A protein has these predicted regions:
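Surface-exposed, low-hydrophobicity beta-strand/loop segments enriched in small/polar/acidic residues
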Residues: 1-136
Length: 136
């Protein structure tokens, strides 16, 4: 094996990453995103696919993003996501049409709600991505 020097190699502590949009999105702000088959981010329509993170407010004009534009994606820590329905503090959260909803058995989870929220309110979420166990 070749000799390697890892001096200067660091763990990236950034809360966000920059990804390429796989589709045009009218308003990406505070929506949950997933990767498409090309490795670009798109709105997560439901909880059936692994979640990349959520947009922490980007886009040019009112959150509008064109296919190929750069999108900021928050991948860890705590953030605010638009709610797609009523969510209670402590519930596991997944995506429905890009918005946060209560996760069902087998769904991919973006995290746990740290606040209550009604539909179209912001819900505070501690990001902790995993797949919820299927019902037995």
């Amino acid at each position: 094996m070749a000799k390697r020097n890892f001096n200067g190699s660091q763990i990236n502590q950034s809360v966000t990453i920059a990804e390429q949009a796989g589709a045009a999105i009218d308003d990406v702000r505070n929506l949950i995103l997933k990767y498409d088959e090309n490795g670009d981010v798109v709105v997560a329509t439901d909880g059936t696919a692994p979640i990349a993170g959520y947009n922490d407010i980007s886009g040019a004009e009112s959150g509008k993003v064109a296919k190929g534009d750069q999108v900021d994606v928050q991948i860890k820590d705590i953030g605010y996501i638009l709610a797609g329905g009523a969510i209670k503090k402590g519930e596991e959260v997944t995506a429905t049409a890009g918005k946060a909803t209560k996760a069902a058995d087998g769904d991919y989870v973006i995290g746990v709600a740290l606040s209550n929220a009604a539909e179209n309110d912001y819900v505070r979420v501690q990001i902790s991505k995993y797949q919820k166990n299927a019902a037995k």
